[in-house]
Amino acid sequence: MWRMTTLLHLTALLVLIPLCHCASMHRHDHYMDMDQTYPNGLGYCEPSGESSCKAGFSYNRDICQGPYHWHTISSCYKACGHKRRQSPINIWSHKAVFLPYLPRLKFKPHMKSLDTDVTNHQNRAPEFEPEDGDKLHVKLKNLVDGHYKFHNLHIHNGKSRRKGSEHSVNRHFTPMEAHLVFHHDDKKEIKPPRVKLGGVYAGRNKFVVVGVFLEVGDEGYGDEPDDDECKRILKGHCENNGDNGNNCDNGNNGNNDNNGNNGNNGNGNNGYNGNNGDNGNNGNGNGNNGYNGNNGYNGNNGNNGNGNNDNNGNDNNGNNGGNGNNGNNGNGNNGNNGNGNNGNNGGNGNNGNNGNSNNGNNGNGNNGNNGGNGNNGNNGNGNNENNGNGSNGNNGGNGNNGNNGDNGNGDNGYNGDNGNSDGRLRRWDLANVRRMHAERYHFSGGCIVKKAKRLSRILECAYRHKKVREFKRNGEEKGLDVDITPEMVLPPMKYRHYYTYEGSLTTPPCNETVLWVVEKCHVQVSRRVLDALRNVEGYEDGTTLSKYGTRRPTQRNKHPLRVYKNSI
């Protein structure tokens, strides 16, 4: 009998010794704090008995403070182990239920720039926290009431550079995932939604979290900003990075930040839509910067647009009034005051040897080639004495308005072309539209992927700054002031297709009171953003966030969660 007992003791020792050795190896693997513990041989962690909702936690999956055992750290974190509606999840796109009456995602007010404070959060993702979140609310009509105010913006990364998003769609992850967190105003009662998604806490969600998948890219993001440039960027000043968002993301026209009427702005590029939007019907001294350069879609940029105008010096050329800048409006290239560099309009005409000479009083610019056929003289090739080019108006089909019209060296719209006499886009115009469009976006899976250039510059500079990059103990944090527009993180309005479900916070205390809105279309930032985030120190020994990442593993709930979508 005693021999059997001895044999059992020896067997137990043989099993326990390797387990202890393995645990000791993990203890030295990475510093966290002196209270870290490890699962027993069965992978079980004893509850700590703590009740604080500020207890420390880790993303190291080998220890009891890691994401698999968050529910044992504190009784405040017990929801992390409920498995009822825990987030993040994998979303199967073909199983998501299409609801056509789901609202469009908006913010109120639109494009609001906020002063935020960003700090090193140790082993968690740095958070951009607004000084006054009451100034911005999420707007999801009929799905939630209007009292969810902006709480913070943070971005999750992974241990792997390619797998950093917390959510996934059809098991596909991206390098990062941005979360825009909105918290319901505690002073207001949560109103039940008209559109009910079901679930345990239907209509009782205290949070709305917008998740955006972030890709990384290299092209179109310019050189790495230096320290002086970062100081300007973080305070909201514009650098020449056109990007749909913020006050100065529509093309940075010279020194004017906002994309208003740019006229003589020096070297500014007129951005994606130029100054005049799609129709470019301004022509009043400020250059006509629509899609098609000076003439817009309709080529009606002059004050005197589409008429059969007499006297080419004072009116627009031809039947459809093509150049806009030829009118009586001061800064037009070909008009009475012809301040552009265009003068000499046309390859074939001598610009009015028989008329008023040189297209207006001051018209002889240096480089103006207003079309292959456009003879803008008063008696040009037209059949009518003072009607300029007769049916050829508009300075020809290929007219390039000199060195970019009134914007000095700026680009007047896509190509600064003068459009057609019938106001329609030429084939080469469409090609240029696509080319410029491709510089700012690319298409993937029926979505448009926005290249968030300005957001990239802000994140690069913020994560590189020592107040954010260097590890800080609790109470020693020094915040960095950053101006940011949360809407920069989102896809363009037209492409805000999303999945929605009722889940939980992805960090302790893992409260199951969150309405998730996960954007289907991705946003691209520069690869330098990912590098800078991974280099943020998350631990006192200088270990960075690249070691364990800041993503919670995909949760497998007891029952699949209902997921809905607002697009097919």
Curated annotation (Swiss-Prot):
Residues 55-567 form the Alpha-carbonic anhydrase domain. Keywords: Calcium, Disulfide bond, Extracellular matrix, Glycoprotein, Lyase, Metal-binding, Repeat, Secreted, Signal, Zinc. It catalyses: hydrogencarbonate + H(+) = CO2 + H2O. It is found in: Secreted, Extracellular space, Extracellular matrix. Residues 1-22 form the signal peptide. Transmembrane segments: none annotated. Expressed in both the dorsal region of the mantle and the mantle edge. Is dispersed in calcium carbonate and also linked by disulfide bonds to the organic core of nacre. Its cofactor is Zn(2+). Zn(2+) binds at residues 154, 156, 179. Pfam families: Carb_anhydrase. It comes from the Eukaryota. Residues 291-318 have a biased composition (Low complexity). Sulfite and sialic acid may provide the necessary negative charge in the N-glycan to promote calcium uptake. This is N66 matrix protein. It comes from Pinctada maxima (Silver-lipped pearl oyster). The lineage of its organism: Eukaryota, Metazoa, Spiralia, Lophotrochozoa, Mollusca.
